[in-house]
Amino acid sequence: MARFEISTEYLVQTLVDLLNTPSPTGDTDYAISFVQGELEGMGIHTDRTVKGALLAHIDGLRSTKPRALTAHVDTLGAMVKEIKPNGRLKLVAVNGLMWPTVESEGLSVATQSGRQIRGSMVLANGAAHVNKEASTAPRNADTMEVRLDERTERAEETRLLGIEVGDYVYFDPRVEVSGAGFIRSRFIDDKACVACLLAAVKGMVEAQATPAQRTTLLISNFEEVGHGGMDSVPADLYEMVVLDMACIGEGLRGDEFHCSICLKDSSGPYSKDLSDRIRGLADRRGIDLHPDIYPYYGSDGSAYWRSGGQAQVALIGPGVDTSHGYERTHKDALTDTAQLIAEYLVDE
């Protein structure tokens, strides 16, 4: 049986708060500050890296095989690439954004002055009564534009609002928590795992438990572009557990109600010894952990290894439906993931 009391209420509320805090790759300071405040409130000292990620070091009963856990707070997003002659905006994705999924979505343009200007993402010349190809036209960065909720019809008028090339664009997350326990939102990847990590650490602290090994927590902020997982982690790490969303789809075992362990992704297999240990730990604690292989996937663990990291690496996370779209998970998967993290922290 599990040894820790995981507060599902805290976990879900923390996730909701994170989801409502914009953090596209490259513009994550507010979300990092939120996580920093949560950890500091638990009595855990934190530091920022030069790149803006968050590090926390927790003393363990031993330091013979130091550990790290990492989850990323950066999400999909976009930046202003061009102010068009008609005053509307052409965007560029900062990572793996799928353009059809953000059509008609509300958004905010964050200006250098701190103002947030509302608008929406639409197909250029998208009126069905005018353009007979509106329903079949491709949706991509060249065919879609931001329609600002301001009176502007020229590029000069848009610039007078304070908007300029390079401004970040925050798509509305549209967070909903259902009575049946589902959480539906954009950007559950990977804020769900950040919330799970916080809930696990909270459960461990409240139980007055100590990690089995000296442990580093890394909240990375450049995972979605491939260089988050190597940021300032100790050189003497023996193992790293990456916390990232589990895939759901045809041919996979994962679902929205369970935690999964990825044994191989696009970068190759993860460490068998560490993965086997985590699977055994889940079995002993009654956690139904689903093994899986992800066909189109990479993680901060892959980035850590590519940068020369020597530690063993494993990857776990809650099942998330429709990744990089309007995502959904369930509190059962979140609770199981947090429980497994807490168990791993203290496991001998």
Which residue stretches match the model-derived regions?
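N-terminal hydrophobic/helix-forming segments and targeting peptides
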Residues: M1-E348
